[in-house]
Amino acid sequence: MCSIVILKQSDSEWPIIIGANRDEMQNREALPPGRHWEDRPHVFAGKDLTAGGTWIGINDFGVVAAIMNRMNSLGPMKNKRSRGELVLDALDHADASESLNAIIEIEKDSYRGFNMFIADNLNAYWIKSDEKNSLIEYFNIPDGISIITAYDRNDLNSKRIKTYLSKFALSSEPKPGRDEWQDWEMLLGSTYSDDNNPLSAMCVKTEMGFQTVSSTMIALPSFQPKVGSSKPIYRYANGSPDKVSFADMTI
């Protein structure tokens, strides 16, 4: 996964809303979200059929986790474990703080560099494992819009973030209780880039087969939601989001 957009609103009926695009080689097969792991029946996520892990998912406690590569760490490496395992590990816990504590205790050198997002309806974290740094770092995600790619959170050195941070900030925020997602659907499916580089777009399309292969939107309700909005909402586009519509998933 290469991009995750986070809207954190601590006092809202929906304190966490995320939109995430998975950028991958088109021929890397995956299953759409489901309960694919017999030893983890509490996990609902898409399954990468190459390595067996996942790029984003939710558990029955309302914890969401997602992972992205850091710069210059695309793809597997000999003697390194799959980073998709880490999402499953995070989703073994009952709240985001427990998940965070588990991830920061991993053997860092067993994995290539990554950015990770973990949240529940109270807390949200960005975890950074840079191959140039001996430590795993973590940060609280503040209220407002955040975008994480292979770069740091809201890092304007990322041309994608530089282009789309303001677009998401100025867009009409999703209203999950009313099933209103239009602006975010449009932005997640946008192939526009300021520099005409397809890799700088939110929705990636290249001639070499590397592209946005799916898109996910998740909303977490507060502890005291209004009638009709007590469960997380999970929406999924099984393909490029400029072509494939989002469908509501039954968790």
Across the structure, where does each feature detected by a protein language model lie?
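N-terminal nucleophile
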Residues: 1-251
